From Swiss-Prot:
One BP annotation, GO: tRNA N1-guanine methylation
UniProt subunit comment: Homodimer.
EC number(s) per entry: 2.1.1.228
Taxonomic superkingdom: Bacteria
Keywords from the UniProt entry: Cytoplasm, Methyltransferase, S-adenosyl-L-methionine, Transferase, tRNA processing
Pfam families according to UniProt: tRNA_m1G_MT
A GO cellular-component term linked to this record: cytosol
NCBIfam families: PRK00026.1, trmD
Protein name as it appears in the record: tRNA (guanine-N(1)-)-methyltransferase
Organism: Trichodesmium erythraeum (strain IMS101)
Amino acid sequence: MRFDVITLFPDFFTTPLNSGLLGRAFNKNIAKVNLVNPRNYTTDKYKKVDDESYGGGVGMVLKPEPIFAAVESLPTLSKREVILLTPQGKRMHQGLFRELATDYEQLILICGHYEGIDERVQYLVSREVSLGDFVLTGGEIPALALINGVVRLLPGTVGKAESLECESFESGLLDYPQYTRPANFRGWKVPEVLLSGHHAEIARWRYQQQLQRTKSRRPDLLKNDDN
């Protein structure tokens, strides 16, 4: 999987992409990230990437020329998707990550900034994606979230496939409670069923906990087909 990230702040990605599970995945060449600064594709001496909005308004708008030039400079793999990170896009969910990890080999992520991005960038974009119903200073954090969510689903990133299958949202439910040693901490005890060694009973208990937790915390998931 190849990620090409169009961003004015490439340094923002350095530490997260070299740490933990993501860092190991990139070191093993399971995925590759290419950071592209559109400022390098400007044609004026000031390297200007933004300008005032036609019709007036507060804030600056990212110009289309550097974005187009940056994207068009990239190699084109056969299964490619160009994604704009914007609060106006569809919200990320586990089903989206599965689709991107399975169906594509190149994801180009365009990080918006300032007041917005020139609407004509739509002619480049396959889809718009949002981290949630809130506004951030730019698309870098959503891009990191998307990269993280997709890379961990690629074969070889997570040691055991069943680790992924049992997680929140993979079954459409939240995850069950997890416990480790000690069995008794300040009077709070691990449920007896988890100490029993009875695998069928443990599986039944975990599923019941998933249902209860989902009904209590995220009842919308029980009605939502997206996940």
